[in-house]
Amino acid sequence: MSSLPQYCECGLGECRTDVLPLLYEMSQIATESGDLSSIISILLRLMKRHMKVVRGMVTLYDRDSGSIVLHESFGLSPEEAGKGVYLLGEGIIGRVVETGQSIVVPCIRDEPAFLNRTGSRDRDSDDANLSFICVPILRGRQVMGTISAERLYDNAELLKLDVEVLSILATTTAQAVELYLVENVENVALEAENRRLRSALGERFKPANIIGNSKPMLEVYQLIERVVRTRTTVLILGESGVGKELVAGAIHYNSPAAKGPFVKFNCASLPESVIESELFGHEKGSFTGAIGLRKGRFEEAAGGTIFLDEVGEMSLTTQAKLLRVLQERSFERVGGNTTIHVDLRVIAATNRNLAEMVADGTFAEDLYYRLNVFPITIPPLRERGSDIITLADHFVSRFSREMGIEVNRISTPRLNMLQSYQWPGNVRELENVIERAMLLSEDGVIHGYHLPPSLQAPVVGDSEAPPDGLEARLGAIEYELIVEALKLHHGNMTEAATHLGLTARVLGLRMGKYNLNYKDYR
């Protein structure tokens, strides 16, 4: 016990003697079983409770893929932890793995190499003053991972002491990490890819990514919030293109089963002869072409959620088998006798009126009531008012990033055009319209002539012209150019006329043709 005083630094305001029992327990596990999970559990508990660490992480280095993967952590949400994948030499963690040397950042705010890859700092009000310690997990001269910690230090000596403590913890952990990497070399790379995919999917399907603040959409958000923490079966109703899959994903990725699979199946995408095999799987030799055992979508979704889109397109035969799964959570593969039990959530969606289908005998009544436990109806885009402009701006911003095209806005007259259109294809149609217009735009603005003919409406004051005729199209362009000039020059007719290459008198005549008033633009 001669080393005890080294860690009893009570003059620093914190004592480190209480880490010794846990350190001893870690070393015993490392010697007797080498169970990495148990060792890391103690390690993280020690950091959190006895070292007052705000966020702690253990990463593992997969030499084959070159990835450094966040293996375990605390202080991070599942979405943040999912982003914890680094390359050799990338950021502080990547540099520690590359050099095998510990790195201490006294103040995160002042260190440009600190990537904040997980995005966790965005939540904290005083996180700019946090310190960051990262030490390598070494076995001989080989780096196998890192241990890192974030916390607020007001004492440089205590910071130095904790670097030493973490280095001892890393040494104690090293043998178990080495064994784990040898036994799970393929799983580490797979874990990195799974984390990346879960993070990407979680971001895509979080409720914040369902665009819209109209009253009908606020009601949808309230229903999602009500059902998200349960395992209740959900039936999502709405026209094609309204975003039923986004709502299903938002429910799954914010539920207790978020770490489980989210399996999607379109019931209208395959012929009746193969749907049963796709959903429930099949045994080897169960039919011509069944050359091996295959798991179905329900087995793949075990522990998570299965999303059955276009459920109204199922045949009555398949409906009967789906009803059994909903009632008993069990089924048999095609050609098999073994009953398979699954624990999962079912979310179904349709653009059909299932109640009418029940009445005319094309949809099973029992199945309808099993699915219709918690219905969520997504309104069509034409009923969402201001959401049309919000969505259009969102798509402009997204496609600008994805395509590398500099488009700043949609012209004012065309915003009116977007709002007056009925959008039979809903959000999907709007997305396609904006993507097309982005490709056609040349001056950073989406004009009316960039939109498809189906959106072109007759111009005010030109009701005699056919809506698809040349005069109407030219009038639409002229109307838009005048409105843009008036808006740009805040209703100053002289400046607007100069901008358009007209006299103020001619501009006034053209404005009269379209019932435009310069005062509306001041």
UniProtKB/Swiss-Prot annotation:
Q: Where does ATP bind?
A: 238-245, 301-310
Q: Does the keyword Transmembrane helix apply?
A: no
A GO BP entry: phosphorelay signal transduction system
Spell out the InterPro entries in the cross-references: AAA+_ATPase, GAF, GAF-like_dom_sf, Homeodomain-like_sf, HTH_Fis, P-loop_NTPase, Sigma_54_int, Sigma_54_int_dom_ATP-bd_1
Stretches assigned to the Sigma-54 factor interaction domain: 210-439
Q: Which is a Pfam family this sequence falls into? A: Sigma54_activat
State the PROSITE patterns in the record. SIGMA54_INTERACT_1, SIGMA54_INTERACT_2, SIGMA54_INTERACT_3, SIGMA54_INTERACT_4
GO-annotated molecular function: ATP binding; ATP hydrolysis activity; identical protein binding; sequence-specific DNA binding
Q: Which Gene3D superfamilies does the protein's record reference? A: 1.10.8.60, 3.30.450.40, Homeodomain-like, P-loop containing nucleotide triphosphate hydrolases
Which residues belong to any copy of the GAF domain? 35-177
Q: Where is this region: A domain?
A: 22-183
Q: Does the keyword Nucleotide-binding apply?
A: yes
Keywords (A to Z) from UniProt: Activator, ATP-binding, DNA-binding, Nitrogen fixation, Nucleotide-binding, Transcription, Transcription regulation, Two-component regulatory system
According to the UniProt record, which residues make up the DNA-binding region? 493-512
Q: What does this protein do?
A: Required for the expression of the V-dependent nitrogen fixation system in Azotobacter vinelandii. It is required for the regulation of nitrogenase 2 transcription. Interacts with sigma-54.
Protein name in the entry: Nitrogen fixation protein VnfA
